[in-house]
Amino acid sequence: MLSNLLILPMLLPFLCALILVFLKNNDRISKYLYLGTMTITTIISLMLLIYVQRHRPITLDFGGWSAPFGIQFLGDSLSLIMVTTASFVITLIMAYGFGRGEHKANRYHLPSFILFLSVGVIGSFLTSDLFNLYVMFEIMLLASFVLITLGQSVEQLRAAIIYVVLNIIGSWLFLLGIGLLYKTVGTLNFSHIAMRLNDMGDNRTVTMISLIFLVAFSAKAALVLFMWLPKAYAVLNTELAALFAALMTKVGAYALIRFFTLLFDQHNDLIHPLLATMAAITMVIGAIGVIAYKDIKKIAAYQVIISIGFIILGLGTNTFAGINGAIFYLVNDIVVKTLLFFIIGSLVYITGYRQYQYLNGLAKKEPLFGVAFIIMIFAIGGVPPFSGFPGKVLIFQGALQNGNYIGLALMIITSLIAMYSLFRIFFYMYFGDKDGEEVNFKKIPLYRKRILSILVVVVIAIGIAAPVVLNVTSDATELNTSDQLYQKLVNPHLKGED
């Protein structure tokens, strides 16, 4: 009976999206329906996560067809902490959007498309078979294609073209990988694939397939293949930029973690060093981006790229500590990047400028805003006791155990550069000078202050309650790095030769 609740985090947003299509002219009802739905979704996800932590993973077999023949949803520590975190930030993002009163965007069913994107994101975390992961990716991407073009500006359309082309190529590669893998192992269920690949051992065909998935998911995660990201994020409004930054690349990172711990772990002599190399390249280019630009929205976009490098570096260490740190940092980064883009969006709103050298005098108007900015910088930099610290320490530990001293050095350097680029914005906000004149600021709306306050509290809470979060991420790491344990807890009836 409890397993039936596993469909609700995806079903509730889907039903709400359909209802909102017919309520586009009633903003008040739409607001309460959406926020109520996502709040309930977050609570249900958290309850399921608590149950899984105390007992065992939950599976839901649709239509009474057990794995590997039927569609299966899996609620384990990894999937449910991702669903809970994603549902929480989506709730805040939509509260932010309704607070802005985006009436023009509502005519294009903006809330519905955000919910459809949420369905794809949450479904990607919950599904336990390869084809349905592809379906969820396509739902997510179709909704994102619409959202990225809603403004109808030339800049958005140009960014959308790059975004669409690269993601279509990624989807083709994903589908090609699915076909080749099914031909090779004859199944699409995760646990069944893991068992059969383990029985096959080292195989050139499987290695080629794993490389195809690596490229496909790298395009989704902006790992090296990030050309679409800075331009796309820079032209979006604040809530959509926060939504994309918090979730879109993280789904790709999640898929990389799930695939290259559980499914293709026996090919780590090739894949994991390649992942570490790609992570290093991503970190370096991201660091160059945050230094090169004066546009604060593009600086924020390159911060996303750096964080993806951190996460995948942890995965590339192929150690328990590194993978555990990657999962922790992945969860943390969803919240922190939401906070970053809300702060950057608020800066643009209250000052009217996107170039940091034109920001000055904010200290006199909004001193508490500066406190939120500093906390965000420390969280991104991994300064104790804030939320970025535990994940980075574990990734450091994993890199040391793996002997990846170059990756470790690059992570330290790029972390400092990431902090420097944000402190540079902070300096101009408080001590900068624009021809000796003070910028005429708008007042930060109360709803923005409330949402920023909630995110700041959560960032601090993650750092303080790190042992609780690490307990979840450690369980997730243990389950996904042991295919035998995964089979025992998820699908004990399956055998490799079935």
Curated annotation (Swiss-Prot):
InterPro entries: CPA3_Na-H_Antiporter_D (IPR050586), NADH_UbQ_OxRdtase (IPR003918), ND/Mrp_TM (IPR001750). The chain crosses the membrane at residues 2-22, 32-52, 78-98, 108-128, 130-150, 161-181, 209-229, 240-260, 271-291, 308-328, 330-350, 369-389, 406-426, 451-471. One of its GO terms (cellular component) is plasma membrane. It is found in: Cell membrane. GO terms for biological process: ATP synthesis coupled electron transport. It is a multi-pass membrane protein. It holds the Pfam family Proton_antipo_M. Keywords: Antiport, Cell membrane, Ion transport, Membrane, Transmembrane, Transmembrane helix, Transport. It comes from the Bacteria. GO terms for molecular function: antiporter activity; NADH dehydrogenase (ubiquinone) activity. NCBIfam families: PRK12663.1. May form a heterooligomeric complex that consists of seven subunits: mnhA2, mnhB2, mnhC2, mnhD2, mnhE2, mnhF2 and mnhG2. Belongs to the CPA3 antiporters (TC 2.A.63) subunit D family. This is Putative antiporter subunit mnhD2. It comes from Staphylococcus aureus (strain Mu3 / ATCC 700698). The lineage of its organism: Bacteria, Bacillati, Bacillota, Bacilli, Bacillales. The gene is mnhD2.
